[in-house]
A protein has these predicted regions:
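A conserved ligand/cofactor-binding region detector
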Residues: 7-833
């Protein structure tokens, strides 16, 4: 009997998949790994056995892809990111192998529910927010489009944290996602590299009078990659995500242990372990800052070393490197790559500075993800110089030469130097270095890019206009429709064919069905089924009964003040007041659903979570309102529960302060699943509005120009708004009058103060919550009224889906390829393999 991998490879795509062979493979895996049969295996053991069977198939295609890359030697992008928020792999891999339904049926025949098996898989704790999810979507699209790529990141043992809610407060606990072993990774010790920290630099001159630099008395760790397969959709292409683990160079010291110095015996092991324990260690103290910088340098150095080793297998002249390699730096975290590539080229490859700089500046490109200056990373020079002494010297020289350029272009203009220098005021400004060295600098939505060019990075744009470009973010429809919402995916395929899976623009054909009562009813039934699924999840995890016939109004995203979860919950408080004052008011039942993690050291964000849960406790337990209003906070928001949430949402909350959100991608996932957006004209909302129009979104609030104008003029006074709006004033006062904190009236004082009183150098209501509140409440009232018109609402939902085509990450990646990376597709033929 042929192994499952061969059966699938040769037969599955022509619909002769053998369920019998697949089950035999699973059975053999259980026997060999656990000494068990299918009947007595645990759910976790079944997950592992099924995953190993699927991995067998992937391995053949992975090897074949690598052979093609070795043979054809195409240009490769190394996508460097601190985060990769991948989501569960089993279901997604089966979707991309075109095998999900067949495997589901095979498992059903032996009494195994594929959904229960999928629920055994942990979400790999390799990311946290939109930055990491974007990177994951990009990897999926690169493989599906057939472009050779490596993702480069860190194999965090515990992720950022697993969120638990206790008495309404966020509690951070380790996310031990590796405890049962992860089947979709492959340790590659043959590609380990040394990464050095600390010590000092010794200069010497050789007989030819050339300077040499050597790092001495350093500590080092070994970077060991674990490769994860990234499966392209139905094309045999499997790219690699290489996530780096840190291992000690010398390991356990038996000599120190025997001498009783137990701490010293494990010193090297602890140094290595600490590097990869958590994502974004708290940097409110020096040790946290040091650890973050070491993490960034660690994975960047290892990734560049592996990239150069791979390049040198095929080429001897490093001047060819820009023709074969591009390093895309996803945000500022990996931007130390500029100096590290220079260090390797100058110190280890012995290239002259000018040659090394020419190569580097044609190999590195930078994606900016933020408009907020405080999020553009800066390191104290003292820390940077102490931890990375030779790299700092490289940065110093890059800066010296660039400041000369500034002075030549703008003689005597110290303000330009202050804004643009890489080293200034005791800090290393990483974004500045990325812009100086990168041949491309891109924003992630049209509005974001324009603000960068005209505001935050205007001086750089004036000096290097040719570098700046826009690449509006996107999402992969394969995970967020095909896998997350199979009912809607099957319905769309019946209506317009399956081509949308690789060409999302084909969903535009659904416009023809937007006015059809039959299509509207079919869509409504699918939406309700998904709402029932989410209601069941909420009951199981929160113990709250929610009405699937209520409006599901959802805000799920990283908790940050500019995203204005506080405004959302203040509006819920406002609605509750209205219902209490007038129980017979015209109000369509509404369930407000939140999901968000707050950074461990972010006080106001954590207090906002507590407020949401306190409001939920009051409202959900008030029988007098007859269930008209419910509030739910979904614990530990992540990709796997996000898929359930997106499919069920009626209303998508995209309410950031205009000009603050670079793009957003949650907005696109909701749109793809037929939710209507309430939002500001910010980030990608602007482009969504251009696609679907004012009739199919609920836009409110100030424009980005208005916000920026107020910020520049310093003329906004939230107290005026507070004094002139009695209903809003009542809501704000409820933060401190005990309505939602009867045992501690001061519990939410910091949130109250943030709205009305200047705080530690920050203006009051920095994110214009009170300024936009009334406009927001009016837009919410429009939702209440519009939802009652079932036909109109369903038409708008269908038109949102029909206009989502632009927002596929396939489109985004093709633009990166055309304008920045200049890659060629590879073709992987499995015939005869």
């Amino acid at each position: 009997m042929l192994p499952f991998s061969a059966i699938r490879r040769n037969k599955m795509r022509d619909n002769t998949f053998s369920k019998k062979v697949f089950i035999k493979t699973v059975s053999d895996n259980l026997k060999n790994k656990y000494r068990k049969t299918i009947d007595d295996a645990t759910q976790q053991e079944l997950y592992q056995a099924v995953s190993e069977a699927v991995k067998d198939v992937i391995m053949d295609e992975w090897i074949a892809t690598q052979r093609v890359m070795d043979k054809d030697d195409p240009k490769v992008v190394y996508y460097m990111s601190m985060e990769f928020l991948m989501g569960r792999a089993l279901g997604n891999n089966l979707i991309n192998l075109s095998a999900y339904k067949e495997v589901k049926e095979a498992l059903n025949e032996i009494g195994v529910d594929i959904n229960a098996i999928e629920d055994q898989e942990p979400d790999p704790a390799l990311g946290n927010g939109g930055l990491g999810r974007l990177a994951a979507c990009f990897m999926d699209s690169l493989a599906t489009l057939g472009y050779p790529a490596y993702g480069c990141g860190i194999r965090y043992r515990y992720g950022m944290f697993k969120q638990q809610i206790s008495d309404g407060f966020q509690i951070e606990v380790p996310d031990n996602w590796l405890k049962d072993g992860y089947p979709f990774e492959l340790r590659r010790p043959e590609y380990c590299y040394e990464v050095k920290f600390g010590g000092y630099v010794q200069e010497s001159t050789d007989e030819n009078g050339e300077l040499h630099f050597e790092q001495k008395d350093y500590q080092s760790v070994l970077a060991v990659p674990y490769d994860m397969p990234i499966v392209g959709y139905d094309n045999n292409v499997v790219n690699s995500l290489m996530i780096w683990d840190a291992e000690p160079k010398n390991g356990f010291s038996l000599e120190s242990f025997d001498q009783g110095d137990y701490d010293k015996a494990v010193e090297q092991e602890n140094l290595a372990r600490n590097l990869v324990e958590v994502l974004y260690p708290n940097d409110n103290h020096v040790k946290g800052k040091e650890l973050r910088l070491k993490q960034q340098y660690f994975f960047v150095s290892a990734s560049i070393q592996r990239a150069l080793a791979r390049f040198k297998k095929h080429h001897s002249d490093l001047k060819d490197l820009p023709n074969k390699v591009v390093f895309q730096m996803n945000d500022t975290h990996p931007t130390v790559a500029v100096a590290e590539l220079m260090r390797i080229l100058v110190d280890e490859e012995h290239l002259p500075w000018d040659d090394a700089w020419d190569i580097t500046t044609r190999c590195v490109a930078y994606t900016n993800h933020t408009i907020m200056a405080e999020a553009l990373e800066k390191w104290p020079i003292e820390i940077f110089q102490r931890l990375l002494p030779r790299v700092y010297q490289i940065v110093d020289e890059i800066n010296r030469r660039f400041v000369m350029q500034i002075n030549e272009r703008y003689p005597g203009n110290e303000d330009k130097v202050r804004k643009m220098a890489i080293l200034y005021d005791g800090q290393v400004k990483m974004a500045n270095m990325a812009i100086v060295a990168g041949y491309s600098v891109n924003g992630v939505a049209k509005l974001h890019t324009e603000i960068l060019k005209n505001q935050e990075l205007h001086d750089f744009y004036e000096m290097f206009p040719e570098k700046f470009n826009n690449k509006t973010n996107g999402i992969t429809q394969r995970r967020f429709l095909a896998h997350a919402n199979p009912l809607l995916a099957d319905w769309a395929t019946k209506k317009v064919g399956a081509g949308w899976i690789t060409d999302l623009s084909l969903l535009s054909k659904l416009k023809a069905y937007a006015d059809s009562p039959v299509a509207q009813q079919e869509f409504a039934e699918i939406k309700r089924a998904n709402k029932v699924r989410l209601a069941k999840y909420i009951k199981e995890h929160n113990g709250i009964d929610v009405n699937p016939d209520s409006i599901f109004d959802v805000q799920v995203k990283r908790l940050h003040e500019y995203k204005r979860q506080l405004m959302n919950i203040l509006h819920v408080m406002y609605l509750y007041n209205k219902i209490k004052e007038n129980p017979s008011m015209d109000f369509y039942p509404r369930t407000f659903i939140f999901g968000a993690k707050a950074a461990a050291g972010y006080r106001n964000a954590k207090k906002t979570i507590k407020l949401i849960n306190s409001v939920a406790d009051v409202i959900n337990n008030d029988a007098s309102i007859g269930g008209k209003l419910k509030v739910v906070f979904i614990e530990d928001y992540k990709v796997s529960n996000a898929e359930i949430i997106f499919a069920a949402a009626d209303v998508s909350e995209q309410i950031s302060t205009a000009s603050k959100e670079a793009s957003g991608t949650g907005n696109m996932k909701f749109m793809l699943n037929g939710a209507l957006t309430i939002g500001t004209m910010d980030g990608a909302n602007v482009e969504m509005f251009d696609e679907v129009g004012a009739d199919n979104m609920f836009i409110f609030g100030m424009s980005s120009d208005e916000v920026i104008s107020h910020e520049n003029r310093h003329d906004y006074n939230p107290v005026d708004v507070y004094n002139n709006d009695a209903e809003l004033r009542k809501v704000v006062n409820q933060l401190v009058d005990g309505t939602y904190s009867p045992n501690d009236h001061e519990l939410f004082r910091e949130l109250y103060n943030s709205l009305l009183n200047p705080q530690q150098g920050q203006v009051a209501d920095r994110y214009f919550i009170l300024a936009d509140f009334r406009s927001y409440a009016n837009a919410q009232q429009k939702i209440n009224d519009y939802y009652k018109n079932k036909s109109a609402w369903r038409k708008s939902a269908l038109l949102n889906i029909a206009h989502v085509g632009k927002f596929s990450s396939d489109r985004t990646i093709q633009e990166y390829v055309d304008d920045i990376w200049h890659l060629d597709r590879i073709t992987v033929n499995m015939a005869g393999v």
